[in-house]
Amino acid sequence: HSHTTKPLFYKISGTWGNHEGSLLLWLLVLTLFIFLFLLKSKQQNKQYRVLTLLFQQIIIIGFFIFVIKTSSPFNFIFPIPNEGLGLNPILQDPALAIHPPILYLGYVGSSIIFSSTLAATSLNYISREWAQHIKQWVLISWVFLTIGILLGSIWAYYELGWGGFWFWDPVENVSLMPWLALTTLFHCILVLEKRLILTSWV
């Protein structure tokens, strides 16, 4: 979905302008979070780190198989467009160009929280130290998801002409539910960090 006459910004954003490209972006962000977890968790228990990475690898392998089987970005296009297919005009907007990566940083970032919690529960590792460690990942995901939702609402308001920033349709609700879950989780972790309670909620 790139085009030779488009600015570089839209050539790059055209990568995730279709279903296959957006799933590739999803895998890229998932890999990025695994790398960041490796860097930021060096002080944590080795078994906990290994088990967290194992759960993350299961997730990424599942997505990889799904992409190859159902949404392969390597399928041939015939006839080959000389200048490129180009991006849908409604998607040629700065807010929407950065909306998917930011939203994915929020969505995919929560996979680290999921894997870490599974690992910590399996090893009985949930403690104040673990709460301090996981809190930063919850906050990162929450911030990016918040920005992504706001960008999507602004774009929908002036581009689609819905007449408002928010409507209770499935497209918007599907991003609101994880945001509410992350907000609740963040507050539970704050309580866990200070009082060592609400472990079952976390």
PLM feature segments, named:
Residues 1-202:
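Polytopic transmembrane helical bundles with strong interfacial aromatic enrichment
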